[in-house]
Structure formats: C-alpha cells, structure tokens
C-alpha cells in the first residue's frame, strides 16, 4: 500500500520540478534548521520542514504536501546524521531530479552514538549537532553557502543577516559559559542522550538513562541512583516525545525534578537558555 501511495505521489508531483527555476522553496529536515534559515533569509524564501512540529525523526513519514514542496525545492538542507534522510534520499530525488542536497553538518567532528533501537541515528554517530552553539556556527556557514548558491541574487542580504546571526550565537555561548562557570557538579542526567555536543562544548558529562536505545535495566537504574545521590544530581532531562515513567521513578528515588526539553523546537536560542538555566541550578 505504501509503495502504491509513493508511486501515486511521484506521478502527481514529478511535473512540479519543471517550474523550479522560479521557486523560492528550501527544504530542511527538522524545525530548528528553519530557525537558522529564517535568520539568514528573512522572508526571502519559503521553508518546507520535513519533520513538522509535534512529530519525531524516529517515525518519520512524508506527507503529500511535503512531497509537493520538495518537487519545487531548489535545495534540501540535511542534518546529515538522521536515518530518515538516507532512507528517503532516493525517493526525493526521483521526484525532483535537480534537487541539491547539502549536508549542513559537514566539518563537524561527530560524536559516536549508541545503537539506537528507534533508528533515529544514521550509522553510529550522535545526530544532535544543533544543540551546541559551536556546532551551529558550522551549520550556519554551510547553510549560508547553500543559500547563496541557490539564490545568488540575495547574497548581499544573506551575508548581512548571517553576520548578525553569528553575533547572536557568540553572545549566547558567552551567556552559557558565564552561567555554568561556577558549577562544580558538571554531570547531566538525561533519558535519551541528546546533549553530547552541548556537553562537549561546555565541559560537562552527559549520563543517559537509556542504554542502546532501550529502557534502563534495574542494575543501570540502581547505578544511576547511587551516582545521583553521591554527586547531588537533582535534574533529570527528558525529551517531550519520550515516556517519562523511568525519569519520574528516578526523580522520586533521588528527590529530584524531571525537566522536559524539546530539542526539535523552532526557538533554538530559548531552548539553549532554558536547558542552561536548569543545569546551573545544580551547585
């Protein structure tokens, strides 16, 4: 049935690529990327987000409206480390033969990830590169270059906005460093290990409850409880799309607090500050 639907979509939208020369559509994999494209382009392009608000890369299925936008897109800006990107690449290029595909994370040193039972990760690397300002500067530069290539007539405006964005990112990095500087307890408890790049930049240690994409074993939970009590860790982060049962159980054991974060939120800057504020409460 899925193959039939895909073929039907392919037939319906393949002809759309003929008008792509006048298109101002840019496709991105996840919502935070839209934030950065918007920061660089203003209202000069339309952004098609493949994983829409409230959805997850874990169970991604393309919508007909997204296929239509992809058929008109000049470029697809990938994160480059998400499994669905590889899974759908051939199908997307079948619909739009001229689609330029750009790995926005090119130049980032990837962090090895665990085996993910939900298949979010492509290969063996952690995909959450957008959750650290240092990596975002690389992503922003790759995004700028791709946008200038696709829309050279707007290069001047893009450069002005890009430089303004870099200033915001540098300012945010400084704020985070300042808030975390007094911190002696530099451990982060998190259900799904999404903060590895953040931890690398700001010299923190990420401790995941999840193991290889699976629920924590009783032994692992006991080890985490012992560690949290010993080091006075009281904050447990969990992404909003995950079941909070184990995190809540752990919080009761250590007298802690479960904090829900949304790595896929559009407002990237606010997410970074909210995460930092909570980490900074752990003296």
Specify the residue positions occupied by each region the protein language model found.
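Short, intrinsically disordered low-complexity segments
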Residues: 1-2, 17
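C-terminal motif of bacterial Sec signal peptides marking the signal peptidase cleavage site
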Residues: 12-14
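Sec-dependent signal peptide recognition
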Residues: 2-8
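Extracytoplasmic metal-acquisition and chelation regions
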Residues: 16-283
């Amino acid at each position: 049935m899925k193959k039939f639907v895909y073929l039907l979509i392919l037939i319906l939208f393949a002809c759309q690529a003929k008008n792509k020369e006048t298109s101002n559509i840019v496709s991105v994999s996840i919502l935070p990327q839209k934030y950065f494209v918007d920061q660089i382009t203003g209202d000069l392009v339309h952004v098609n987000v493949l994983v829409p608000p409230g959805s997850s890369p874990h169970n991604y299925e393309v919508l007909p409206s997204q296929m239509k936008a992809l058929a008109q897109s000049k470029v697809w800006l990938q994160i480059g480390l998400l499994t669905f990107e590889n899974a759908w690449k051939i199908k997307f290029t079948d619909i739009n033969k001229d689609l330029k595909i750009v790995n926005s994370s090119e130049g980032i040193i990837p962090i090895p990830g665990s085996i993910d039972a939900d298949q979010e990760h492509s290969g063996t690397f952690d995909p959450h590169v957008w959750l650290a300002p240092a990596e975002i500067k690389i992503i922003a530069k790759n995004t700028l270059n791709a946008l200038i290539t696709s829309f050279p007539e707007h290069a001047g405006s893009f450069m002005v906005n890009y430089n303004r964005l870099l200033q915001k990112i540098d300012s945010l990095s400084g704020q985070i460093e300042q808030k975390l500087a007094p911190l002696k307890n530099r451990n982060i408890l998190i259900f799904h290990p999404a903060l590895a790049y953040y931890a690398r930049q700001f010299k923190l240690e990420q401790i995941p409850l999840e193991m290889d994409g699976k629920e924590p074993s009783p032994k692992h939970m006991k080890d985490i409880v012992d560690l949290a009590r010993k080091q006075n860790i009281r904050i447990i982060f969990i992404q909003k799309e995950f079941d909070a049962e184990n995190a809540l159980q752990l919080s009761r054991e250590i007298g802690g607090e479960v904090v829900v974060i949304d790595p896929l939120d559009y407002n990237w800057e606010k997410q970074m500050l909210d995460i930092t504020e909570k980490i900074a409460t752990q003296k």
